[in-house]
């Protein structure tokens, strides 16, 4: 293990002891924002320090085995112990290197998932509904909480646009690679000739700001309109102007929320989504230059980029960024995304390791 890496791990060990002390104090929950930051940091570095403790134990075992080699009667045993200790050290060092990769500061945040129907008309809207169900089923498997923020249903079912909030530890780290264009190939229910149609939707996964104040929004830059909420087909669901449309004038970002009968709640939801969209826009602008110099296979989050194809006649899903094809489409659409997400995370980590190697 490199000295620089060991030094970093020693620092984390010291920091974990400090966090344990801070979190054991009686007034630790007096400042909830600070408490969240401390618990988040503790959860992040705890497993790293535990791995490092195992590496140090393996190192101690290696030194003990080396001392035993001098005793002829213990040599065979010592050689076995030495091999085992070095194998453990090598495995743990590789795992620690991955664990020490630069962290996305948004990884542990809650998220907003925005799905928009694209080319394909009604079939695209139906597929948007299928994608929403896929993510909701995945969230259910993770025991995450889901809240509908905004929906624009289509006449035949599905959605022209839908936004949900998913709350759960690590939600962004697991679903951030879903941003982009999703293409579906299947025979629509309305197709009488049995022809396969191709439709598309775009997905945007945005980290939630810890609080709206985290993103600077000047009230003077907002235009807030109220209007009468309506359901699919234009039927009025109430007779008051409870729906809210918030426009951020500098960026042109518009958010509508009408799912609640309370205008106040709709406005609050709209501002949360707006803060997330502005944060997302700032994040992508900040990383645009970096992306131009080092083209990343995944993680660009470009909504115009086609990332995946779902072919129903063949029962397959292909992720074009990593050339992964899985013939388990039914399970995937039911929220079984673990294999896919693990492959995307693994590729992302490999890219980070490669970029660190280039920098050295």
Swiss-Prot record:
The modification N5-methylglutamine is found at residue 235. It is found in: Cytoplasm. One of its GO terms (molecular function) is translation release factor activity, codon specific. PROSITE patterns: RF_PROK_I. Its main location: cytoplasm. Gene3D superfamilies: 3.30.160.20, 3.30.70.1660, 6.10.140.1950. HAMAP family: Rel_fac_1. Peptide chain release factor 1 directs the termination of translation in response to the peptide chain termination codons UAG and UAA. Belongs to the prokaryotic/mitochondrial release factor family. This is Peptide chain release factor 1. It comes from Burkholderia pseudomallei (strain K96243).
